[in-house]
Regions:
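A residue-level signal for conserved active-site and pocket-lining positions in enzyme catalytic cores
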Residues: 1, 29, 58, 103, ...
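ASCE P-loop NTPase helicase motor core
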Residues: 1-49
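Short acidic-glycine loop/turn motifs at beta-strand connectors
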Residues: 20, 107-112
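Hydrophobic/aromatic beta-strand patches that form the interior of the parallel beta-sheet core
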Residues: 25-27, 92, 145
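ATPase catalytic-site recognition across NTP-hydrolyzing enzymes
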Residues: 34-94, 99
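Short beta-strand scaffold segments in enzyme catalytic cores
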Residues: 101-107
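Mg2+-dependent endonuclease catalytic cores in nucleic-acid-processing enzymes, primarily RNase H-like
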Residues: 112-227, 250-254, 260-263
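Acidic, Mg2+-coordinating catalytic module of metal-dependent nucleases/exonucleases
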Residues: 229-251
Length: 263
């Protein structure tokens, strides 16, 4: 019993047994049919999630994950010429891969995320990235969302973890104790690119060429729901995903409604 996770996994194979094996029975109940979640929460989910994720989490649908990973990305809808708001507070997603090490710089205003800059440094380490961020943004308040592996990982000499280095530079660091599922990160980004209602709350300034190229070109490995990392498009996407998933996670802690069926 649980939410479907695409076609390429054991739960789909077990579910199909109910259609072909007389010793098995398979049942499908949507969240609405289960009457455990209020209609208001369902409507809120439509605002928070993209169509495929909503179908998976609320409509008990096995969704095909193949081809373009960030399928909700549109050059017409998600790319803007410039950001005109206040950039006093910067939110930066950080991927610790050393070749290249990538940072995605954003502003968040009323749940709208705009990518305004990108940093990509080859053969680098955490100290160098921190120095570059400090040099570029001397007057802004900076919040960094790194890969949770920063709690143990060391990309610089000196014995300090990446998390300790970030804090030593004076950054406000926010990361979970454990890394979120890759698919949850992807679904969170797709949901910001466009929700069920067709509304976009994630935009990219057109000067961020590497972010745009990465989000547009990363695909799944053929016949799987495993993101391809051989092309090098994963680093910027991972950096963005850590930030988005931390602030806008895919919620599954539904609040049950009071049952009135037997009253």
């Amino acid at each position: 019993c649980g939410s479907p996770r695409g076609f390429g996994n054991w739960s789909y194979e077990l579910f199909k047994q109910g259609e072909t094996n007389n010793d098995w029975e398979s049942f499908k109940y949507t969240t609405l049919e289960g009457e455990q979640v209020s209609a208001e929460e369902i409507e809120q989910a439509k605002q928070d999630l993209d169509l495929r994720t909503f179908q998976q989490e609320y409509e008990a649908t096995f969704v095909n994950y193949s081809g373009m990973i960030y399928y909700n990305f549109s050059r017409d809808k998600n790319i803007v010429e410039k950001y005109k708001g206040n950039s006093l507070f910067l939110h930066i997603g950080l991927d610790f891969n050393v070749d290249p090490m990538c940072a995605v710089v954003t502003v968040i205003d009323k749940n709208v995320v705009t990518v305004i800059d990108e940093i990509q440094i080859y053969s680098s380490n955490t100290n160098e990235m921190c120095e570059e961020i400090k040099n570029r943004y001397k007057h802004q308040n900076i919040i960094i969302y790194p890969d949770p592996s920063a709690r143990q990982r060391k990309t610089s000499a000196g014995g300090l973890t990446d998390l300790a280095i970030l804090k030593n530079f004076g950054f406000d660091v926010r990361c979970k104790n454990t890394a979120p599922l890759v698919r949850d990160r992807i679904n969170a980004v797709n949901s910001k690119l466009k929700n069920v209602a067709g509304k976009s709350t994630l935009f990219i300034v057109n000067t961020c060429k590497n972010v745009i190229k990465s989000i547009e070109r990363q695909i799944y490995k053929e016949g799987t729901h495993i993101p391809d990392k051989d092309s090098g498009f994963d680093h910027m996407n991972d950096a963005l995903g850590y930030l988005i998933e931390y602030n806008y996670p895919i919620r599954r802690n539904f609040v049950p409604t009071e049952q009135k069926r037997w009253s």
